[in-house]
Amino acid sequence: MPVEIEPWEGIKNAYQHGPISKQVLKLKPFYTYRGLHMLEEESEDCQNLNIWAPKGGAEKKPVFVWIHGGGFFGGNAFEEYSFEGANLARHGDIIFVSINHRLNILGHLNLDQYGEEFKDSPNVGIADLVVAMKWINENIAAFGGDPENVTICGHSGGGGKVQCLFQLKDAAPYFQRGIVLSGARSDEAY
């Protein structure tokens, strides 16, 4: 299960993106061909987020949380320049947040048959999202955001993750609205 970050003193340099989850090797040529940010540092310690906040403007700005696509096995919070939130934050007068979390076997391998301590193993990638949403709720006001006005949005696999968060009572206090863009199918063929 994810571990919440320990507080630190002073200012934390956040000028570079944090590591992304380990990626499926066969997808790397596709992403590289498209010029996407897929050659970033990969790590199991990839639970990080990016925040864009405009200068000035209204207090208690709406918060828009982006959950990337890529199924539950690939992608990252800044894989395309169009997913960086600077322009939307600036022109929409919102706080834009994107989340990295564990994917593939690091986030969804089911080990519960090996004992009680592994009962939550198939859901640690989703648990990463819940912990990120909790952090946003507790800290977004420091960036000018309103923790009572949070919309989560995801496309493709990210849409499926938004659907998962809608079903979790642990996630419910941390957002008020959700947008699913081509989310997960629910039939057995998926």
Regions found by a protein language model. Give the residues of each.
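Short, well-ordered amphipathic alpha-helical segments that serve as non-catalytic structural scaffolds
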Residues: 129-137
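Short glycine-enriched nucleophile-adjacent loop
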Residues: 159-171
